[in-house]
Amino acid sequence: MEKSWFNFMFSKGELEYRGELSKAMDSFAPGEKTTISQDRFIYDMDKNFYGWGGRSSYSNNVDLLVSSKDIRNFISDNTFFVRDSNKNSYSIYFDIKKKIFEIDNDFSDLEKFFYSYCSSSYLNNRSKGDNDLHYDSYIKNTKYNCTNHINSCIDSYFRSYICIDSNFLSDSNNYNESYIYNFICSESGKIRESKNYKIRTNRNRSNLISSKDFDITQNYNQLWIQCDNCYGLMYKKVKINVCEQCGHYLKMSSSERIELSIDPGTWNPMDEDMVSADPIKFHSKEEPYKNRIDSAQKTTGLTDAVQTGTGQLNGIPVALGVMDFRFMGGSMGSVVGEKITRLVEYATNQCLPLILVCSSGGARMQEGSLSLMQMAKISSVLCDYQSSKKLFYISILTSPTTGGVTASFGMLGDIIIAEPYAYIAFAGKRVIEQTLKKAVPEGSQAAESLLRKGLLDAIVPRNLLKSVLSELFQLHAFFPLNKN
């Protein structure tokens, strides 16, 4: 464990280096040379240190003396020895990898080095000068400022290292409300001496989470969703699940897609009570098939990997089937095949346009050849729907659409539409490379590549999908029931 200095020196003299602390820390990239002295640099915090949100300064009139090494390496796994203006000394220990943060009074060897440093020529040469009263009051107020500086450096490091959202940790003018500060200081603002304060991060390293106050996923998951690409937050009321910051398309549940496409109050589900009965008594060492079905049902609230029913799209009656990837990867078993078959037959009898939204990993292996037969069964009723009745079927491919679904009804639409950046394939990249011993070009299985090769008719963004479908139906003589 490396031991380093984290000392605060107080003076009224001329400063050698000025600027915002955040800029100073950003300038010390790993392996980067600086023009500042390799031993130490003095930093002016007077009216120059601002909050993450650009608010008023947290502390004033404190000069920070630290090593000029990279601030991230400086904090990542070190022990710091700190002394305040009241001669109180303590050590701070960080270990990012083990997620440990400790404050301790046991400084032993560090204390000797500290006092030898305090007697150095730098401190002895600092004179009070003429403004002694100002200097004394300046020193008396440094305990609070010193604490805030420690907190500021800690927060700044964690913000850059763990990508903390500034609006999450700093949402007021009072720095004392920050999460890190609450770990260091008690309500009275005094330094705590207890040990083993722990800081934990979530899987995406997007923010710091306190079990009581900052558990966003538990308290606010009904309001916000997090982008799995840039980790930005999106308001759930915007129902298209497209990141406003990076444009990434997030997965949508079948219920969300129905709500996005179907007019409110017009959805009539079909065959909701149909469940799988484990037809081949599939044996698994890890988890029985029935247990997996039960677990998926509890997680998703669905009976199987597809929802079917009828409703109105901008006033136009339609038959709609939406697959849900959350339910065992959207795999197609006997229940999925039967529900889609019944939906197509109903649409044929009622002369309704048909929409099938695909999101699947393919046939369900736990049902063996029965799952493969669903490909032929659905294709058969679609042939009657399209060829005999001359009705209109639109296939919508979302990410991912693979395997037996791609090889059957996914590619049988009169119009085949895909979402932007959707992954569409029969066999996955890994399977192809292991079978053919050839590398699969990057992006060759993306919707944009398939559109260029003529396998798709269009790529339609989610926010335009409903209006595009409405126009396509009207072009094929399917009109709203009530015209205003």
Curated annotation (Swiss-Prot):
Q: Could you confirm whether the keyword Cell membrane appears in this record?
A: no
Residues in C4-type zinc fingers: 227-246
This one is known as: Acetyl-coenzyme A carboxylase carboxyl transferase subunit beta, chloroplastic
| Localization terms from the record | Plastid, Chloroplast stroma
Which chain regions cross the lipid bilayer? none
Q: What class of enzyme is it?
A: transferase
EC numbers listed for it are 2.1.3.15
Q: How is the cofactor bound?
A: Binds 1 zinc ion per subunit.
What does the UniProt function comment say about this protein? Answer: Component of the acetyl coenzyme A carboxylase (ACC) complex. Biotin carboxylase (BC) catalyzes the carboxylation of biotin on its carrier protein (BCCP) and then the CO(2) group is transferred by the transcarboxylase to acetyl-CoA to form malonyl-CoA.
Q: Which GO terms describe its biological process?
A: fatty acid biosynthetic process; malonyl-CoA biosynthetic process
- UniProt subunit comment: Acetyl-CoA carboxylase is a heterohexamer composed of biotin carboxyl carrier protein, biotin carboxylase and 2 subunits each of ACCase subunit alpha and ACCase plastid-coded subunit beta (accD).
Source superkingdom = Eukaryota
NCBIfam families associated with the record:
accD (TIGR00515)
Tell me which species this is from.
Answer: Capsella bursa-pastoris
> Which cofactors does this gene product need?
Zn(2+)
Could you cite one Gene Ontology molecular function of this protein? Answer: ATP binding
Quote the record's binding site residues for Zn(2+). 227, 230, 243, 246
Q: Which residue ranges does the record assign to the CoA carboxyltransferase N-terminal domain?
A: 223-484
The family note in this entry says: Belongs to the AccD/PCCB family.
**Gene Ontology cellular component terms for the protein in this record:** acetyl-CoA carboxylase complex; chloroplast stroma
Which controlled-vocabulary keywords does the entry list? ATP-binding, Chloroplast, Fatty acid biosynthesis, Fatty acid metabolism, Lipid biosynthesis, Lipid metabolism, Metal-binding, Nucleotide-binding, Plastid, Transferase, Zinc, Zinc-finger
The question of whether Oxidoreductase is a record keyword is answered with no
Q: Which reaction does it catalyse?
A: N(6)-carboxybiotinyl-L-lysyl-[protein] + acetyl-CoA = N(6)-biotinyl-L-lysyl-[protein] + malonyl-CoA
A Pfam family that the UniProt record links to this protein: Carboxyl_trans
